[in-house]
Amino acid sequence: MTTAAASWSPQPEGLAELVELFRQSTSTEREVQRRIAHRLDAISQIPDYLNYLVLVFVQMTGEEVSTRSVAGLLAKNHLYFNAPRVSPESLAFVQHMILPALSFSDTVLRNVATQIIAVLMQVVKPVNWIDGLSTLTQAMDSSDLNEAEAALSTFAKISEDMPEELDACEIQGMRPLDVLIPKLLHATAHADARIRVHALNSLNQFIQIGSPSMSANMDAYVAVLFQRATDERPIVRKFVCKALVYVLSTWPEKLAPDMNSVVEYMLYSTQDSDEDVALEAAEFWLQFAEEPRLSEQLRPNLPRIIPVLLKCMVYSELSLLMMGDIQDDAAEPDRPEDIRPRHYGGTMHRSERDDEAQGSGHKSRAAIDADFDDDDEWDDDELDDDLDDEAGSWNLRKCCACLLYT
């Protein structure tokens, strides 16, 4: 840390005011919220505003989790939206302060810490934050399960945000990914499902860009995918299916020797009771159909694939109820747009889905967290959202229709 950053200390009055604003931020009164937002907007103009936020988040352990998490989220947003205005001294201060937060005992605070570190890595770049990469790498092997999970979660976020920059990073002639890829492969067998998912999610980012570090470990990765194919957690199987799609599009020759087994697995997974797993498996057939090098292997399997796709196209009872008021137009001739799927082509559609996730606050990462929520209760809003998804979003039925059109 620079001398200026090391010698920084807050003004007591300013720190006290900020903490009080964060305490009040839980109020539901509109006028209180308006006043807090106005005051924070004014305070955010001071040069060391970020230092105050990180100090409250990391060091003020006597405050409520809600108070500290507000400070942390504001720090993350300030970094993300105002990076050019943040001084090198403030960046150095945050780099020094934030890494110990990976071992916070509170889940909310740890999650906020992972977000701050991921954004900070985007701002300063991996090659300029060797300590950050080194700490994450070491923490992945921590005996503290929470710290290890936080480190893997952070690296998954960074991998999603900047895979090319991680791949290009060299430090004193060494590529960090040459060390990290084997470590991630090992983590896919971890007893904790969260860690398995973070590892698979990270590795998938480097498959997509054709990373040399990934290429050197592809045989090991394909073996890992086969090992995790029957994982008890649907979200792990979802990432296995996603990985197989990426391998098929990038290194199809790696699957060729075991293609019969892969086909059997994907047929089974396309009928998985978890629709997220089934949808990812269905994407595999889209990629399969578009890969001319595999046409000879696809053709003999069509008699088994097509009935599965037709079965998956059947409307659910809920969908039929939703369409009950739609006018019957069976006597009217179909237009081309009625027949041709709106999302056509596996590669194109996957790009749309990836862009959607990146442009909407990292939905994929939020989905990972949501899938570990054991609360199966639905409220009315969640049911409405589900109905909207069925009506308008890409789903298993539409994917299978697209496949048959292909």
Identify the function of each model-found stretch.
Residues T2-L53:
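N-terminal alpha-helical scaffolding segments that mark the starts
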Residues A5, E20-E31, V58-T67, M97-L109, ...:
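Short coil/turn segments at helix-helix junctions and helix-capping linkers
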Residues G62-I117:
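Eukaryotic helix-linker segments that join adjacent hydrophobic helices
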Residues G14-V19, Y49-M60, E64, R85-L102, ...:
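HEAT/HEAT-like alpha-solenoid repeats
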Residues V124-S213:
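Solenoidal tandem-repeat scaffolds enriched in leucines and small polar residues
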Residues A4-A5, I306-C402:
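Acidic, serine/threonine- and proline-enriched intrinsically disordered linkers and terminal tails
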Residues S25, L40-S44, L74-N82, I116-V123, ...:
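Hydrophobic residues within the alpha-helices of tandem HEAT/HEAT-like
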